[in-house]
């Protein structure tokens, strides 16, 4: 149980860190995507519809309550990770933790499949998750202002230190520091011990 908690929390933290890093760049911004979509509407009703359609396109990929190719248009965008994918993973890990606490197993073998993956409402958990996902699509005003935030170089340096140290716990024999090339502006891994 302790290992499950440790590794699931690390994974969730990685998603949050990814969102923080991506938020430094407007081209990776779900917030910008939503703001631009809303700008196409003239009335509040039209703006909400544009936001709903823009959200649906990159999440459930459909307008109905039982999409067949959900997650088809997955995007690793700031705002979408933090607001959509991270909460989904939190819900999944919470459900698994409940099974661990109760001493019951969780099986996905035999669940209804669509295109090689669990169907949108394959079991009670996925049904509840689907309801949350549909609710997310129907929520308006999701865009964070400003759409970009933070200094990407400072964040990269901080995350490199964090994840290099962490990677050594997982890959003790294969991780080596990267050595600056001659021009000191690019980096290459020469496979040498430093």
Pin down the residues of each PLM region:
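Catalytic domains of carbohydrate-active enzymes that cleave complex glycans
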Residues: 1-194
């Amino acid at each position: 149980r302790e290992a499950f908690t440790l590794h699931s929390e690390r994974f969730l933290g990685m998603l949050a860190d990814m969102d923080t890093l991506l938020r430094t760049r407007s081209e990776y911004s779900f917030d910008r995507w939503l703001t631009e979509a809303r700008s196409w509407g003239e009335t509040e009703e039209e703006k909400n519809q544009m936001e709903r359609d823009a959200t649906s396109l990159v999440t459930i990929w459909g307008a109905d309550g039982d999409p067949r190719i959900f997650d088809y248009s997955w995007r690793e965008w700031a705002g979408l990770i933090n607001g959509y994918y991270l909460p989904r993973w939190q819900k999944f890990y919470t459900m698994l933790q409940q099974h661990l606490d109760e001493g019951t197993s969780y099986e996905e073998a035999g669940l209804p499949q669509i295109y090689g993956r669990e169907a949108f409402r394959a079991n009670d958990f996925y049904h509840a998750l689907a309801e949350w996902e549909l609710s997310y699509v129907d929520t308006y005003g999701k865009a964070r202002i400003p759409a970009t935030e933070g200094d990407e170089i400072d964040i990269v340096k901080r995350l490199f230190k964090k994840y290099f140290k962490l990677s050594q716990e997982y890959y003790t024999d294969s991780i080596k520091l990267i050595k600056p090339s001659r021009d000191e502006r690019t980096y290459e891994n020469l496979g040498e011990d430093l």
